[in-house]
C-alpha cells in the first residue's frame, strides 16, 4: 500500500508531471532524495506507469471531441477494437460494460468530419452494429 505522502506525490504529478522534486519536497517537508526514492518505488510497483502530456485539440484544429459508443456483433468485438486502434482520430479506446461494448474518444475537425468518421470509417467496419457519438461541450475536470 501507499501512505499519505505517496498519495500527495501522485496528486501533484498527475496535475503536472514536470513538477520538480525540489518543489514536491518543500510541500511535503521532506528531502528531494526522499521524494526521488518514493517516485522510483511507485514506478517499480507499477503505480506510476509513465508520464504524459495533455494536448488541447482545439489548438490543433479539432473543434469537436466526442466520447463515442460502438457496438459490435459479439464475435467481432476484438477485431473491431483492433481496427479502431489504427485510426488517428481515435485518441483513446476502451472496452466497456454498460450501454456500449467499446468507448472511443474521437477528435474531429468539424461536424462534416465527424459525420464522415462515423458513417464512412467506423460505420463501415465489419461487425459494427451501432455508433453513438456524444459531443463533449466542456471539460470540467
UniProtKB/Swiss-Prot annotation:
DNA-binding region: 21-40
Occurrences of domain HTH asnC-type (ranges): 2-63
Disulphide bond pairs: none
GO molecular function: sequence-specific DNA binding
InterPro entries (UniProt xref): ArsR-like_HTH, AsnC-type_HTH_dom, Dimeric_a/b-barrel, HTH-LrpA_regulator, HTH-Siroheme_Decarb, Tscrpt_reg_AsnC-like, Tscrpt_reg_AsnC/Lrp_C, Tscrpt_reg_HTH_AsnC-type_CS
Keyword tags: DNA-binding, Repressor, Transcription, Transcription regulation
NCBIfam families referenced in this protein's UniProt entry, alphabetically: trans_reg_LrpA
Function statement: DNA-binding protein that negatively regulates its own transcription. Interferes with RNA polymerase (RNAP) recruitment by inhibiting the association of RNAP with the TBP-TFB promoter complex.
Subunit structure as annotated in this protein's UniProt entry: Homooctamer; tetramer of dimers.
The name this protein goes by in its record: HTH-type transcriptional regulator LrpA
Organism: Pyrococcus horikoshii (strain ATCC 700860 / DSM 12428 / JCM 9974 / NBRC 100139 / OT-3)
Amino acid at each position: 500500500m501507499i501512505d499519505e505522502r505517496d498519495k500527495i506525490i501522485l496528486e501533484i504529478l498527475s496535475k503536472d508531471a514536470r513538477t520538480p522534486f525540489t518543489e514536491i519536497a518543500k510541500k511535503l517537508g521532506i528531502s528531494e532524495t526522499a521524494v526521488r526514492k518514493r517516485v522510483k518505488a511507485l514506478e517499480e510497483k507499477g503505480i506510476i506507469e509513465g508520464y504524459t502530456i495533455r494536448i488541447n485539440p482545439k489548438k490543433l484544429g479539432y473543434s469537436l471531441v466526442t466520447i463515442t459508443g460502438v457496438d459490435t456483433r459479439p464475435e467481432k468485438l476484438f477485431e473491431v477494437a483492433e481496427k479502431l486502434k489504427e485510426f488517428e482520430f481515435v485518441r483513446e479506446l476502451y472496452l466497456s460494460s454498460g450501454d456500449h461494448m467499446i468507448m472511443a474518444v474521437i477528435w474531429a475537425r468539424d461536424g462534416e468530419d465527424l459525420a464522415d468518421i462515423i458513417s464512412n470509417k467506423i460505420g463501415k467496419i465489419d461487425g459494427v452494429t451501432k455508433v453513438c457519438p456524444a459531443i463533449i461541450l466542456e471539460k470540467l475536470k
